[in-house]
């Protein structure tokens, strides 16, 4: 318990230093209102509805405090929020934030790729749920479907392309993890990862590798995938993301996933950064 309290204190101390420009409640309120209007086009803190007190707490915290933490752009914040909600399968909230993402400049192709990126992490059925939700937003906005194709590989090139990406981002792959799997089928899983994850998905257009790595870390944070968070820290660094950007991304996830999952990811970032 003492360890958890200590970690919380460290996280909060870092957040407070990043939000030094917010000096009183009125500053927080004004920032909240501005961000909310930019994202959704409406008014925050209306005091209306069935639970106005909780909505005030939620909106001030997310849009007045979390949105002021770190060096992320509004586009990055909304892509992170959308991929977190897709991973959690909180589809009504995903629909709202998909609209917000478009409002702050995320293109339809980028948003679709954010959804497609979830497939290797959470499986095809849940990815399709998220895609269907985002497609509803596209249709409501008159965006014609299907969108422009973004595939970059063929049957002949997917392995070579995937291996090139994997070797650059994760030298050594997962060979040691799959050693000893019965029937030698660990080798099949290794090839699936290379061909499907890196070849079919990571090579696609619209999102660059740096963005894919950052968003992937947010998925793993949401899933509390401790082992993969260690390795994907280095994948992010190899792609050009700084430890500070990774930290800000995890904090952006925090209001949606809660403190325990976020603190675990922040602890891992701290451990890997210190090595």
Language-model features: where?
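Helix N-cap / loop-to-helix initiation motif
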Residues: 73, 107-110, 208, 240-244
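Short, structured motif recognition centered on aromatic/hydrophobic residues
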Residues: 76-85, 114-115, 211-220, 249-253
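Bacterial N-terminal signal peptides
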Residues: 6-15
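Sec/Tat signal peptide C-region and signal peptidase I cleavage site
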Residues: 16-20
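Substrate/cofactor-recognition hotspot
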Residues: 113, 122-125
